[in-house]
Amino acid sequence: MEAVLTRAGLWFGAMVLAVLAAAYAHDGGFAAQMMIVAVVALAGLWVSVARADVGAIASGILRMPADPSKYDDDPVRWGVLATVFWSVVGMLVGVLIACQLAWPQLNVEPYLNFGRLRPLHTSGVVFAFGGNTLIASSYYVVQRTCRARLAFPGLARFVFWGYQLFIVLAASGYLLGITESREYAEPEWYVDLWLTVVWVAYLAVFVGTLARRAEPHIYVANWFYLSFILTIALLHIVNNLAVPVSFLGSKSYSAFSGVQDALTQWWYGHNAVAFFLTVPFLAMMYYFVPKQAERPIYSYRLSILHFWSLIFLYIWAGPHHLLYTALPDWAQTLGMVFSIMLWMPSWGGMINGLMTLNGAWDKVRTDPIIRMMVMALAFYGMATFEGPMLSIKSVNSLSHYTDWTIGHVHAGALGWNGMISFAAVYFLVPRLWKRERLYSLRWVNWHFWMATVGIVFYAAAMWVAGITQGLMWREYGADGYLVNSFADTVAALHPMYILRAFGGTLYLAGAVLMVANVWLTILGRQRAEKPMHQAVYNASADRPIVAEPEYLAEAAE
């Protein structure tokens, strides 16, 4: 009971402080966000008092639960549910802003205009959908590969709920116009501080689990996860160094200025793509692809070479975002050179993942989850070829500031991050909820095709739009003046913007189908359907044996 009172007291104190901060706030946005914190603290107080499990709390939140033989999968289950929820929210906002670009009348001032919804979309899919995927999958993978329960179970739960609070504060801030205007780092100083606390707790849980492992070897997926956690911490702290105007206000000013500010921002921005959207998703690939294919990783040595090559090269490539700017030319060239070198280790990882399917290629036809993983690896290979190509100065002179970059980013995000995340969710749900199988594998197949066709429409439309923009912007007449005004280029892109909205809608529809599939699986239902076609397979020839048509068999008789 004493522990319950202590926790209730902490929640009550947090609520009082939040209410006082809201009362004395220097601006309305800060007051609104402090009231959100107060509501969260009130909910925590209510849970502590009304639903307290005195026995569990008395045992100590940092001690092992009674049965150490089972893995601690509660935070993983919550993370999977959060992943599914935020995927739909983030993609729904993405479809809305795609429609706003095609039909500007859909902008609603001030809260639902493109300027406020665009960072909500990017943070929603990167940090809410992607971040929850990574936290949940890392908790699952580190326990299985270390044969140990999560260290600090209470802290693991704090990480989950603390991260959801970060998402809510960041998202509500964007709608209120509270932003640092730094790509992928829009939240203001107090939200950044909260995320730092949550991230340190995440690091403690992950490293603590590694330290208590029963398996002597640390599997390579955990190397990728740990580098993700450490590097994102470094990037987040340095890039978000700022001086608040007031400790009771939302506004702050960066510690950097001028070209140093730009370089610091894109050192962070590029490496957010590298160490948030690439490295930890490769950790997922190195665990889930072999598990689903029931094959060992093709080359463990190649995975180690892949890891160290990426770690050394990726951190230097940020200046390629600042080609043809005030950044010194030597720094631009350095970023270009390291970006080109990244092509080989990136493809090494793709090849390692694809070659893991040696002897199991028949499953690509019969297992839509494997098919999603293969498509994810294909898009990873394509995006990591296109990125170095776009960093070459002569190519970048055409693509810079155009929608080609948008197409490149979304081919990677939708194809690589989205597909591998969906596959991981489909892998995890039956195992976490102890179900025989998913509600419907055929729905997974439908999801795969809707997502794939949606990506093709989206990326192709943006590639065409980007090249159109680049060529129209640089077209000069005989008199030496530009032929096209900016408005002319925008009008020319209208058909491509409609195609982008259509592709995004298809991709969103697939995610909604996933939500239904996951929910019905959790409820324990199974759709009455024939299993996916299993062709008779000739292993030596690595191809299916084509059945003889019935009329030929009858003629032979």
Give the ranges of each region predicted by the language model.
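Membrane-proximal first intracellular loop
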Residues: 67-74, 116, 185, 214-220, ...
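Conserved, charged catalytic cores of large soluble enzymes
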Residues: 62-63, 235-256, 261
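Hydrophobic cores of alpha-helical transmembrane segments in multi-pass integral membrane proteins
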Residues: 3-57, 77-178, 190-210, 222-247, ...
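Acidic, Ser/Thr-rich low-complexity segments on the non-lumenal side of membrane proteins
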Residues: 547-557
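Membrane-interfacial, low-structure loops and terminal tails that flank and connect transmembrane helices
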Residues: 54-76, 360-363, 435-438, 528-541, ...
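Active-site-proximal inter-transmembrane loops
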Residues: 255-264, 399, 404-406
